[in-house]
A protein has these predicted regions:
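Single conserved hydrophobic/aromatic residue that forms the stacking wall/gate
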Residues: 1-7, 12
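Structured alpha-helical segments in the cores of large, soluble enzyme domains
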Residues: 148-153, 336-347, 374-381
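Long, well-ordered mid-to-C-terminal structural blocks that present hydrophobic/aromatic surfaces
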Residues: 314-346, 352-366
Length: 483
């Protein structure tokens, strides 16, 4: 599916391609930083830049790499078939109306070429043009791998994205933050049973799968298969194929599939080959620290299409913002529609928070008893997405997707002594470098934060005094060449 999308008209109009040889070790990411990374990447970088295909990868003559396919919200919307302002609502509807995946016994496109670990020349370093994002990375990373596994007790399956570093010719490290992702729960249970957890890692799939896989509880609790969200978006089930070396399924249309087993009770140091102290750049814009508690995947086989396309993402890029942020919007909107129907008209997980730390809520006040519900909505948003740190509340006449308009509301409809609500001592996200006891005495542990609400809405009784200047409605057809 991804291969057809990469070559489609909807993507090709903002895609660049090069035959210049590129080194996957830091150079590839360094080039795309300028071409279109955006997000929380240090400036200069291009916002809403094109996707980029590298056709000539050093030491990987038969492979190509695509990056930035989802680095523009406008492009994501085209790929999903909706307006960019409606992406969160589309994902919300899909999560509420799932279509479960199906398993096909037909020959899968992802298995055109098969490499087994028993082959004498099997080597992950040679099979994958996996990039390192910076010279400080722990090694080459699989950053767009759809990790698929099944709970050993319940038989329920799950798909999630995790960072995975190639550690040897047949080993990957996988970072599973304790208690935060379903595959981590599955691996812990398999360890209790003293058995490995079979896992497939599909790379280069339909963007609907990639975005859908980034949902988190409580919207998608343990037992909810996020592949069903992609099925709902496409109105047809995601097709799976049985793996060739393990008892698990993989996404049939993937470009690459890694088949392996998470080893019970084994932990490895993420930067064991480089000793830099760092893993890779993460979504907040800083280098993530290397973990000393990564789980180990022993790889059994790699399958791929002929002339495969490797897909990758830069951790702090706009692509990651969209992957994380659109499901965040959907989760928040879903909860608010249930608790306060019609009182929040849209949600934007702002790029400056990496799609996780900050949300802008567009609020509707129609009667005087709506006053205060906007702050209730903010509290509910924190419950819908626990990693959220800041919520900005604005009125219906503010474009939440335009930062300048949001800051206009903050400058003209906000007073710091009455419109800031702080909630200290709440668990948030460990990758926020300011959520550390050395930063603030109010923080008792790494990952604890002060959640903050910025209420930039007009008090209901003052609405008439805050009406924006109205301009004359014009004949848009008459002036269509200019507007």
């Amino acid at each position: 599916m991804q291969r057809s999308l990469v070559g489609s008209e909807m993507c090709i109009r903002d895609r660049v391609e090069t035959d210049i040889e590129v080194d996957p070790e830091a150079e590839l990411a360094g080039v795309y930083r300028h071409v279109g990374a955006g997000g929380t990447v240090m400036r200069p970088t291009k916002i809403d830049g094109p996707a980029m295909i590298f056709n000539n990868i050093k030491n990987h003559k038969d492979a190509r790499v695509v990056i930035g396919l989802l680095a523009s919200r406008e492009r994501v919307a085209r790929l999903m078939g909706c307006k960019k302002e409606e992406l969160g609502k589309l994902l919300c509807r899909a999560a509420l109306n799932p279509i479960e995946p199906v398993v096909s016994e037909e020959k899968a496109p992802c298995q055109e070429v098969i490499h087994k670990v028993t082959d004498p020349d099997f080597d992950l370093f040679k099979l994958f043009p996996a990039p390192t994002n910076t010279p400080m990375d722990a090694g080459p990373y699989i950053t767009m791998g759809m990790c698929y596994a099944t709970h050993p007790d319940t038989g329920c399956s799950d798909v999630t994205i995790h960072r995975m570093c190639i550690q040897s010719k047949d080993e990957l490290s996988i970072f599973l933050q304790p208690g935060s992702r379903h595959i981590g729960v599955m691996a812990e249970r398999a360890t209790e049973l003293g058995q490995p957890l079979p896992i497939s890692i599909s790379i280069g799939v339909d963007p609907a799968i990639e975005v859908g896989s980034c949902f988190e509880p409580p919207t998608t609790p343990l037992g909810y298969n996020e592949l069903s969200i992609a099925g709902a978006i496409r109105k047809t089930p995601v097709v799976l194929a049985p793996c060739v070396s393990i008892k698990e399924n993989a996404i049939a249309n993937a470009e690459y599939v890694i088949e392996g087993e998470i080893q019970p009770g084994i932990r490895v140091v993420e930067d064991q080959n480089t000793h830099t102290g760092y893993a890779m750049p993460e979504f907040p814009g800083y280098n993530g620290l290397a973990s000393h508690e990564c789980w180990l995947i022993k790889v059994k086989a790699v399958t791929h299409r002929k002339n495969p396309i490797m897909q990758t993402v830069i951790g702090p890029s706009e692509e990651h913002v969209n992957l994380a942020g659109i499901p965040t919007e959907a989760s928040i909107y879903n909860m608010l529609e249930k608790a306060l129907p019609g009182k929040v008209t849209n949600v934007y997980a702002h790029q400056s928070g990496g799609g996780k730390y900050m949300a802008v809520l567009q609020c509707r006040k129609t009667v005087h008893t709506d006053e205060g519900k906007q702050r209730q909505a903010a509290l509910l948003a924190f419950s819908a997405f626990p990693e959220l740190k800041h919520v900005i509340l604005v009125d219906e006449d503010v474009d939440i997707f335009d930062t300048r308009d949001v800051l206009w509301a903050m400058n003209t409809r906000f007073q710091g002594d009455r419109d800031i609500i702080t909630i200290p001592g709440v668990r948030c996200h460990p990758l926020d470098p300011s959520s550390d006891p050395v930063y603030s005495q109010s923080i008792s542990d790494k990952g604890i934060s002060c959640k903050t609400i910025f209420d930039c809405t007009v008090p209901f009784e003052l609405k008439d005094k805050f009406a924006r200047a109205k301009f004359m409605d014009i004949d848009e057809e008459k002036w269509k060449d200019f507007i």
